[in-house]
């Protein structure tokens, strides 16, 4: 793949099947930065990041998708990746117990569930809840597509390392809607795609990956879309949250530490507000610009 994270869409000339191919190495590394997640959680976040990028590429409108694992009575209470149609991603996990390096999805989230939230820039928000019936995120999302869209869909997700740095990538195959389906053809293409090696996905150009997989097929590869990490936090958003709190609560926080430190779990930024800042906010003025990285 490219030196930068990119998503490629492709189409088979002789089959009613479309595909996507994505590499998110740099974005994955930024999701993990400033966090000390157990290896199994790192791997899970990588899988969710790839899946969210592939799902977001299916949007036909401006908006975003959130893929959220909600843990039950389990050591992993939450894992969430958010992405939009511009392929801007962010994610975070919350761990409250011991997680071994080889923990399975079920062991990490217990009787939890997967929530897919689609939020158009204009229009109604849609939310689907998916039971964790598969052993992997990919299998759970394949079930989601069959339940919600009745479209046969396969996801192929790989995580690992390149030059000792976290790497992740994946592919999606999906039958085109309103097309006559040939299950044997789709299964054949899925079998070919399943042979993709992690190293190939992490390091090779998209056209070479597709040639290795489908050299007997006629495939159209479209212009790529860049994928990046982007957090939506800001000092102004923090200020907007502070002004909704009761005055007594804000005063108590200031008396405890001398200032209020608001920390973004996604990117690690800190936003400090002192008594002068709070007074300014209460008077209806904008937040000043102090930010700590």
Swiss-Prot record:
Subcellular location as annotated: Cytoplasm
Post-translational modification: Under oxidizing conditions two disulfide bonds are formed involving the reactive cysteines. Under reducing conditions zinc is bound to the reactive cysteines and the protein is inactive.
GO cellular component terms listed in the entry, alphabetical order: cytoplasm
InterPro entries membership: Heat_shock_Hsp33, Heat_shock_Hsp33_C, Heat_shock_Hsp33_N, Hsp33_helix_hairpin_bin_dom_sf
Pfam families: HSP33
Source organism, top-level taxon: Bacteria
GO biological process, one term: protein refolding
Disulfide bridge positions per record: 231-233, 264-267
Keyword entries, A-Z: Chaperone, Cytoplasm, Disulfide bond, Redox-active center, Zinc
Single GO term (MF): unfolded protein binding
Gene3D superfamilies in alphabetical order: helix hairpin bin, Hsp33 domain, HSP33 redox switch-like
Family: Belongs to the HSP33 family.
HAMAP family named in the record: HslO
Purpose: Redox regulated molecular chaperone. Protects both thermally unfolding and oxidatively damaged proteins from irreversible aggregation. Plays an important role in the bacterial defense system toward oxidative stress.
Name this protein carries in UniProt: 33 kDa chaperonin
